[in-house]
Amino acid sequence: MPRLTRRFHARDPVTLARALLGQVLVRVLDDGERLAGRIVETEAYLGVIDRAAHTYGGRRTPRTESMWGPAGHAYIYFLYGMHHCVNVVAQGPGEPTAVLIRALEPLEGLERMRAHRAGRRPKARLRDTDLCSGPAKLAQALALDRRLDGTDLVEGEHLFIERGRRVPAGNIVTGPRIGIAYAGDWALRPLRFHMHGNPHVS
């Protein structure tokens, strides 16, 4: 399948968050195995004006540098000292906005995903719907961490997004983002999007 282009990513984060639904996130492991999942849930982060964004107020740190760069790159951060989350940089240089990928519908490499998720509990048997139903879960399932932060999702070898299927506007559910109560009124804005009726959402 063809990959998404730079132009696809270079738009405002709300438009991109909706457009990413139905597209396919691909992770190629060091041994060549392909893991892939359809994007079924996203959240938009609007940069310097958004109290929930890591770049709110123009904050620029080594951790957030990827958000300030070109569209179509990965911004991967470590949360609570336990979990990684993967974002797609939107717009372009100097416009630090991004889309958080919240959930995937696993398509390829499910057994490898299951092994990654089981970790030290190799006998645990996770259902397909539990493999990638949350940002931390999908990062663990696909073996994503800070080493892949800044990866070019258009031209990269180990992490990229392929064109999937367009989700009609009528099949997209909109609501508030999750886990950002600290952001005041911004916590209530309808910036979370997911595919209606999909069992893999978080």
For every predicted segment, state its role.
Residues 1-202:
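Conserved, well-structured core segments that form or line functional sites
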